[in-house]
């Protein structure tokens, strides 16, 4: 007769590890044996997967997750949700947070939520709040966090020591950061106000996406841009498979990055692509991803490969705005490339602004922003790391490439664009920076925090399935497509300077279309 199995109480970290193993194809039976638990417990963990991940993602401490064994809720759950949302936003924005500030805010939310009874945000309540959400420290110095030069020096020294201990090369050190992009915002003679575009018909919310760029410290490995739009399948995509897009596309009802999307990106895109790159360079498959404290970035314990060799590390909130590499001109250069590219396309097509504006779709924008990211030079990225890793900038200083596109270059394009000849330098600069302060994550007002804490749906949650774009439906049959490839091949043959690979690509495309045409005829 077998003895009774000893009761095992798993930590939150254990549950996260089990979830990862289940996602990678592990069986409930095997995991039950490994962790000394029943299969029912494993199934319960699978069932509560999202709740566990959300809880861990909002935690401030990996070490506390390794100790904490329950997700015991607060007796004031709505207040707890509101306070956590508020706390994460304040930390991300670099605002000072202290015990008294938290207590005052908790009292405000308690009454704003219409909760009954007396509430005393005592030191005991604050301690329990920190424990519930694995927050290491809530008291951050009472000065504005966005300019702490001493903290910058301390972090940089500690980070360099960390890199040396882990034996990491610049090729193994990455940074990712989100930003909002008003993809259909064009300059006009009317003044451009930061955060709003004045071109007739522009809808800043509808025509905004979140973009996340990620590259290593050498700038030699740039991952495809991660783009978050509102619609799962925008009309402009038509039959385009999202896997074939020049970006990694995700959807969210407000076109914001969120915890779930970031985790998917990390597990399914970042980790595999980094492994592949490091393997190609003959380097150990080990890397660190440096992040800021955005509310959409999960806990370090969640952002970790199965073998623990690829992981995330966070910039302290009081230094992120000063040294985050992507914010040191990388994102700004990409956006400038994008907008200059739009103007150049308009110029080459010979359209007036109104016609170009009407035809521009999200799909067009994705190809253009991908091109803009490709045009960001490795040296631009490596220089952005000079505050954290001076040796990287020195190593890359031999790159004597031409400078990135300037405001003067964009102004020169404007001079040849009908309807934009008189745009002032001031308006041009405002247009180029119109979304420079867009964070890429949703910043909630107090009233929005309250509605969310009460479980009320956002007004913007409707119609998330399909994005409205005025695109004329057009059906192109196989015969027409085949004729176009024939014409294009004739053109390439006439051009003496066209290289052989270009012609081979078109010939391959022609063969594919012919096969499709034959299959269609045989099925009729």
Curated annotation (Swiss-Prot):
The keyword Transcription regulation does not apply. Abundantly expressed in the majority of tissues examined, including brain and skeletal muscle. Its main location: nucleus. It is found in: Nucleus. Residues 67-139 form the HTH CENPB-type domain. Transmembrane segments: none annotated. Residues 1-52 form the HTH psq-type domain. GO terms for cellular component: nucleus. Residues 168-385 form the DDE-1 domain. One of its GO terms (biological process) is central nervous system development. Pfam families: CENP-B_N, DDE_1, HTH_Tnp_Tc5. Belongs to the tigger transposable element derived protein family. PANTHER family: JERKY PROTEIN HOMOLOG-LIKE, TRANSPOSON. This is Jerky protein homolog-like. The gene is JRKL.
């Amino acid at each position: 007769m077998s003895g009774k199995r000893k009761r095992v109480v798993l930590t939150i970290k254990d549950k996260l590890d089990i979830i990862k193993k289940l996602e990678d194809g592990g069986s409930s039976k095997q995991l039950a044996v490994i962790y000394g638990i029943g299969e029912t417990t494993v199934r319960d963990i699978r069932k509560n997967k999202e709740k566990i991940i959300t809880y861990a993602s909002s935690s401030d401490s990996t070490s506390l997750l390794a100790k904490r064994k329950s997700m015991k809720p607060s007796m004031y759950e709505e207040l707890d949700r509101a306070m956590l949302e508020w706390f994460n936003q304040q930390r991300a924005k670099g605002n000072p947070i202290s015990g008294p500030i938290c207590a005052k805010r908790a009292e405000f939310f308690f009454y704003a939520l219409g909760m009954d009874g007396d509430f005393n945000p005592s030191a005991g309540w604050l301690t329990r709040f920190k424990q519930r959400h694995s927050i290491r420290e809530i008291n951050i110095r009472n000065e504005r966090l966005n300019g702490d030069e001493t903290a910058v020096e301390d972090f940089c020294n500690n980070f360099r020591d960390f890199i040396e201990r882990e034996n990491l090369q610049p090729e193994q050190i990455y940074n990712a950061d989100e930003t909002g992009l008003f993809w259909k915002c064009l300059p006009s003679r009317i003044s451009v106000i930061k955060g709003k575009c004045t071109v007739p018909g522009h809808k800043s919310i509808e025509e905004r996406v979140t973009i996340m760029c990620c590259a290593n410290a050498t700038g030699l490995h740039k991952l495809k841009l991660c783009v978050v739009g509102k619609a799962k399948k925008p009309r402009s995509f038509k039959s385009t498979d999202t896997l074939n897009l020049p970006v990694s596309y995700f959807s969210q009802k407000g076109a914001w990055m969120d915890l779930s999307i970031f985790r998917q990106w990390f597990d399914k895109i970042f980790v595999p692509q980094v492994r592949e790159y490091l393997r190609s360079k003959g380097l150990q498959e080990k890397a660190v991803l440096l992040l800021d404290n955005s509310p959409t970035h999960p806990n370090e314990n969640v952002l970790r490969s199965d073998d623990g060799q690829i992981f995330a590390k966070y910039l302290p909130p009081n230094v992120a705005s000063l040294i985050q590499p992507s914010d040191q001109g990388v994102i700004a250069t990409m956006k400038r490339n994008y907008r200059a590219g739009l103007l150049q396309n308009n110029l080459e097509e010979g359209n007036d602004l109104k016609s170009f504006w009407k035809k521009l779709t999200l799909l067009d924008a994705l190809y253009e922003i991908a091109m803009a990211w490709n045009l960001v030079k490795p040296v631009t990225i490596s220089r952005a790391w000079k505050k954290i890793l001076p040796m990287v900038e020195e190593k890359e200083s031999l790159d004597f490439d031409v400078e990135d596109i300037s405001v003067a270059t964009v102004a020169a394009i404007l001079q040849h664009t009908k309807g934009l000849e008189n745009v002032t330098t001031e308006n041009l600069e405002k247009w180029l920076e119109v979304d420079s302060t867009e964070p890429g994550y949703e910043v909630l007002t107090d009233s929005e925090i309250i509605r969310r804490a009460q479980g009320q749906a956002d007004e913007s949650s409707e119609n998330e399935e399909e994005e409205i774009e005025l695109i004329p439906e057009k059906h192109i049959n196989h015969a027409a497509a085949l004729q176009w490839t024939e014409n294009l091949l004739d053109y390439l043959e006439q051009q003496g300077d066209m290289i052989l690979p270009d012609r081979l690509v078109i010939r391959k495309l022609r063969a594919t279309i012919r096969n499709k045409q034959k299959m269609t005829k045989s099925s009729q």
